[in-house]
Amino acid sequence: MSQIHKHPIPAAIAERCLITPEQYDAKYQQSVHDPDAFWGEQGKILDWITPYQTVKNTSFAPGNVSIKWYEDGTLNLAANCLDRHLSERGDQTAIIWEGDDATQSKHISYRELHRDVCRFANTLTSLGIKKGDVVAIYMPMVPEAAVAMLACARIGAVHSVIFGGFSPEAVAGRIIDSSARLVITADEGVRAGRAIPLKKNVDDALKNPGVTSVEHVVVFKRTGGNIEWHEGRDLWWSELVKKASAHHQPVEMNAEDPLFILYTSGSTGKPKGVLHTTGGYLVYAATTFLYAFDYHPGDIYWCTADVGWVTGHSYLLYGPLACGATTLMFEGVPNWPSANRMAQVVDKHKVNILYTAPTAIRALMAEGDKAIDGTDRSSLRILGSVGEPINPEAWEWYWKKIGNEKCPVIDTWWQTETGGFMITPLPGATELKAGSATRPFFGVQPALVDNEGNPQQGATEGNLVITDSWPGQARTLFGDHERFEQTYFSTFKNMYFSGDGARRDEDGYYWITGRVDDVLNVSGHRLGTAEIESALVSHPKIAEAAVVGIPHSIKGQAIYAYVTLNHGEEPSAELYSEVRNWVRKEIGPLATPDVLHWTDSLPKTRSGKIMRRILRKIAAGDTSNLGDTSTLADPGVVEKLLEEKQSIAMPS
């Protein structure tokens, strides 16, 4: 595999890069052999109120998982992203906002963003929100979403951003779990010309009898669409900030004070509230942003991720703003109203660094040269990829067509739980191979282990684990440290288990092969099969369901659901639509099954365990080697499923 074509470091990048190959080797060695010295130095990327003396205090030991970085230091995240830049670059653009409608865009300077954040911080305080309170944010991709997040950080409130594509039920579940006191939303969102009923979804979520903590809903007017109004509970954003002062003293936070909760899908049941704290997280977001994108002052940077995902937190907002960068926030989608929209935005705003997802790249690739019609993209210097492994064909297309064969593709592997990049090329230090995330970032110690946890040496394949902590690591799951230990540290002792498989080639480059647990990656978004199965089984006509992922040319994985109906119920076209809409309503559009496979029974072991391995193979049409079926209670089930599969229309 190491013989695959390598893309050399372009001369234009090598001339002015922040990290050379020699520097990478030296810094990496220092970072793993003396993390205190290395991260002690890197911590200076931020301004501290009380400087830290202790750098690393971490343990992955069973029953004693504890992660603390810079624990005696104090700082404020918003002050690091805004206040400290005012004297030197107050008039520089902090956020470029590009609307869904291309005629709408605006530039917000660091001074203006600081003013807006101070006003909203005072607004939050006037509503009784204080340090440690949880604020739920369910917003479209508008600058006010960033203002809300930064204002929470400024006063020490913990934000829980909920992706605008989630259903009222999913919103309610996240509010209940976090006991959020306030919800910040908009009347509607806008995406690909369609209105998204955000306020209505919040209203529906708050009707859930389990929601008892919410006192107010702050509503930003995005479209002016008709909405229900609950007097006393609902408050207009514009009216609140009008009354608020533009002066606000940021609250001094300990490095280990909670910053945000972000819910992510797990392999079992309900979503997990991943908790990140202030100091280590921001050091890590800023250093990874700086080095992985080879950021130079004046660069225009565009990360296409929604603020509702961790990529939006770390690499649309906090990493870039901590470094004083200009970050572009895009309300729309890359191929609307035409296939070349993404390329048009690059040209319009002279974007130098573009960070997007393989799903978007594959969708554009399917359009061929229409994706770049009438554009030259000559401003681009660095390309990035995030969300799932990128297949070599899509990588090469992205490099060739979008980047004009001159921009390194920074293929980043990381997770909600890692806070920032774990395995990634550095533009001036890494020769690239299409489809490989290449080598670990500073301080990251990956290993590949077999199913018993034995480390595998050299070129090999295995479960991807990390053997020591890094500053951006999640500290716990909100309100459930036991589940945190169980999920990430119990499979392999004294190691963080990512849930991903990977292989390492002869050059030490890592290739991520995908999830090894029951988690799907659909369009770069994680969905737990258990979550989708629970939604299916809650339908009154469904007895049992098993969900697997199948390869999909655009989305990476599509959702294939095996469904057993209750006795006396018959499959029909109406029920097919009803069940798909049911899941959409329970979780959100992302989780809608692409295929429903009606069946009378599922392959189970004698102990009643569903054999998902077999279901995955049948769904993918890979029937050459179904493996050992002798443990099945009824081996005949497999034949029947294969027969039924013949008549099922598959998504392209």
UniProtKB/Swiss-Prot annotation:
Q: How is the protein altered post-translationally, as described in the entry?
A: Acetylated. Deacetylation by the SIR2-homolog deacetylase activates the enzyme.
Residues annotated to bind CoA: 191-194, 311, 335, 523, 584
* Residue positions where N6-acetyllysine is found in the record: 609
Which cofactor(s) are needed, names only?
Answer: Mg(2+)
GO annotation (BP), single: chemotaxis
Source organism, top-level taxon: Bacteria
Q: Where does ATP bind?
A: 387-389, 411-416, 500, 515, 526
- Which GO CC terms are listed, alphabetically? cytosol
List GO molecular-function terms, semicolon-separated: acetate-CoA ligase activity; AMP binding; ATP binding; metal ion binding
Per the record, what are the reactions this protein catalyses?
acetate + ATP + CoA = acetyl-CoA + AMP + diphosphate
Query: Per its UniProt record, what InterPro entries does this chain match?
Result: Ac_CoA_lig (IPR011904), ACAS_N (IPR032387), AMP-bd_C (IPR025110), AMP-bd_C_sf (IPR045851), AMP-binding_CS (IPR020845), AMP-dep_synth/lig_dom (IPR000873), ANL_N_sf (IPR042099)
Q: Which UniProt keywords apply?
A: Acetylation, ATP-binding, Ligase, Magnesium, Metal-binding, Nucleotide-binding
| The UniProt record lists the keyword tRNA processing | no
EC nos: 6.2.1.1
- Say which enzyme class the record assigns: ligase
> Which residues are listed for Mg(2+) binding in this entry?
537, 539, 542
Pfam families this protein is in? ACAS_N (PF16177), AMP-binding (PF00501), AMP-binding_C (PF13193)
- Report the SS bond pairs: none
**General function of this protein:** Catalyzes the conversion of acetate into acetyl-CoA (AcCoA), an essential intermediate at the junction of anabolic and catabolic pathways. Acs undergoes a two-step reaction. In the first half reaction, Acs combines acetate with ATP to form acetyl-adenylate (AcAMP) intermediate. In the second half reaction, it can then transfer the acetyl group from AcAMP to the sulfhydryl group of CoA, forming the product AcCoA. Enables the cell to use acetate during aerobic growth to generate energy via the TCA cycle, and biosynthetic compounds via the glyoxylate shunt. Acetylates CheY, the response regulator involved in flagellar movement and chemotaxis.
Q: Which HAMAP family match?
A: Ac_CoA_synth
Q: Which family does it belong to?
A: Belongs to the ATP-dependent AMP-binding enzyme family.
NCBIfam families, sorted: Ac_CoA_lig_AcsA, PRK00174.1
**What is the protein named?**
Acetyl-coenzyme A synthetase
**What species is given as this protein's source?**
Cronobacter sakazakii (strain ATCC BAA-894) (Enterobacter sakazakii)
